[in-house]
Amino acid sequence: PFNPRDPAALLESFETSCKLLGRDQIDILMIHEPDRPRQFDWWEAMDDARGPVMDVIDRLKGEGRIRFAGLGGTTAYDMARLIRTGRFDVVLTAFNTSLLWREAWHEVIPAAAERGMGIVAGSPLQQGALARVWREEVETATWLSKPRREQFRKLYALVDEVGIPLPELSLRFLLSEPRISTILMGARSVAEVDGNVDAIARGPLPADLLARLDEIAAMVPFRPHDEPFALPFGRAYAGTPAAGPV
């Protein structure tokens, strides 16, 4: 099993990545889920980002093997703690940076911007929840909270009114945030890639439309209790996983 505290294993992972990429140097090396120690126990001390992984990153940076050190995580507040250590150049924040899920704006984005870090917005379509209009599913999903259901209704009414497809609206919303450097998209087909490119080419959203989206987002400012991390629209739902040990 992978040991995130083993310097030799970390170096081996890096060299394997270089070999697979056909490169001797990597522009950005990111620590995956640095904010969830029950998934990857990277740190000897999280508050100052101290652990073997940083020793390896500092060494690789000094050797010119990597240009930038990054964080890639999904929490809205622990990530900010790591950002404030000043040891990183780039942050990828996912699942808290989209039309309706905006917790990254409370601490992650401001902390990264203050330090001049590159900010990558991951999962702008919220793992498919914003990839299309799920009108029937929103009305029938037993796991969806009443406030979130009403929020989706308002969003879909706005989509119908302005005539902008929901994926395009989602991308152009993020394009309207000047502190975000990169929008990280997943695409399953050439058509989806073309659609993303076309949406970006239309540029940021106008201020009046952004204001209306802000009003809709404010209806549910924080994720409701027990809301599935990835909304299972169109998929079987087996309930919320049990909480693990603290």
Say what each PLM segment does.
Residues D27, P34-V220, P232-V246:
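Beta/alpha (TIM)-barrel catalytic core signal, keyed to glycine-rich beta->alpha loops juxtaposed to Asp/Glu
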Residues P228:
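Conserved PLP cofactor-binding pocket of PLP-dependent enzymes
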Residues P1-L11, F40-M46:
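Active-site mouth loops of central-metabolism enzymes
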Residues L20-I26:
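A glycine-rich helix->loop->beta "capping" turn
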Residues D6, E12, D27-M30, P206:
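A diffuse structural propensity rather than consistent per-protein peaks
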Residues D6-L20, T74-L82:
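Short, acidic/polar
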